[in-house]
């Protein structure tokens, strides 16, 4: 008969395994589960298309990720390829993105609530970093050159900035979810619909309400496409 300490250890291990299971996209239980975007079934992700109706195009996208993208007023453009563009990604737990940065452009502070990101620089130089959770809020940052790789842990606020005033930069990122999501901090806080009470934000940021009103009146650019 197992001792009480052995049972406690087994319980702890089962809890850890269960937590790891729910902490990322579900693992596939068959070769593939192509997303059926027209299915009336509501699940966490997409229902599976009948395998008899699956073909190679469900795993393909002529995305032209080698083609430069036009940037916007924050100086970047994120072209994400996820399950919405390639239905064959359903249950596979991965996406990819091309990020173009104008000179002095940035991918502003944001989080991916459902994915870790690994980024590699294809052209140019990037100053990148992420901030840990409360209470320390430690910044881990690095200047990356062509060919360098950096990891942003799941859910943490992170950013990329092109410090070169004359040359653009390009990066490719892989994300550990078929649908990683993106929450741009400034957009979410100051551009929410309906707006967050200026009294709440003034207290949170320790500024006058007039400053918050001005910030909420701005157009907050979305650079994720």
From Swiss-Prot:
Keyword Transferase found: no
Keywords: Apoplast, Disulfide bond, Glycoprotein, Manganese, Metal-binding, Secreted, Signal
Keyword Plastid carried by entry: no
Major location (coarse): secreted
Cystine bridges: 33-48
Annotated glycan sites: 77, 136
Signal peptide feature range: 1-23
Record-linked CDD domains: cupin_OxOx
Gene Ontology MF term list: manganese ion binding
Domain Cupin type-1: 63-213
Localization (cell): Secreted, Extracellular space, Apoplast
Example of a GO cellular component annotation carried by this entry: apoplast
Residues reported in the UniProt entry to bind Mn(2+): 110, 112, 117, 158
Summary of the function given for this chain in its UniProt record: Plays a role in broad-spectrum disease resistance. Probably has no oxalate oxidase activity even if the active site is conserved.
Family to which this protein belongs: Belongs to the germin family.
Extra information: Member of the 12 germin-like protein gene cluster located on chromosome 8 in the major-effect quantitative trait loci (QTL) for fungal blast resistance. Partial suppression of the 12 germin-like protein genes increases susceptibility to the fungal pathogens causing rice blast and sheath blight diseases.
UniProt subunit comment: Oligomer (believed to be a pentamer but probably hexamer).
Protein name: Germin-like protein 8-6
Taxonomic source organism: Oryza sativa subsp. japonica
Lineage: Eukaryota, Viridiplantae, Streptophyta, Embryophyta, Tracheophyta
């Amino acid at each position: 008969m197992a001792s009480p300490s052995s049972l406690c250890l087994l319980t702890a291990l089962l809890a850890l395994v269960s937590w790891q299971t729910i902490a990322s996209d579900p693992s596939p239980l068959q070769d593939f589960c192509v997303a059926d975007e027209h299915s009336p079934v509501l699940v966490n992700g997409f229902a599976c298309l009948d395998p008899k109706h699956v073909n190679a195009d469900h795993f393909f996208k002529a995305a032209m990720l080698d083609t430069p993208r036009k940037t916007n007023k924050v100086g970047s453009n994120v072209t994400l390829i996820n399950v919405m563009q390639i239905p064959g990604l359903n249950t596979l737990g991965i996406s990819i993105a091309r990020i173009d940065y104008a000179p002095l452009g940035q991918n502003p502070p944001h989080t991916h609530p459902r994915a870790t990101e690994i980024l590699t620089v294809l052209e140019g130089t990037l100053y990148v970093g992420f901030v840990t959770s409360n209470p320390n809020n430690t910044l881990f940052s690095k200047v990356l050159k062509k060919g360098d790789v950096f990891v942003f842990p799941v859910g943490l606020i992170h950013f990329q900035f092109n410090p070169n005033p004359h040359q653009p930069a390009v990066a490719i990122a892989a994300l550990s979810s078929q649908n990683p999501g993106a929450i741009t901090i400034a957009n979410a806080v100051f551009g929410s619909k309906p707006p967050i009470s200026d009294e709440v934000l003034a207290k949170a940021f320790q500024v006058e309400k007039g400053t918050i009103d001005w910030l909420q009146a701005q157009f907050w650019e979305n650079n994720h496409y």
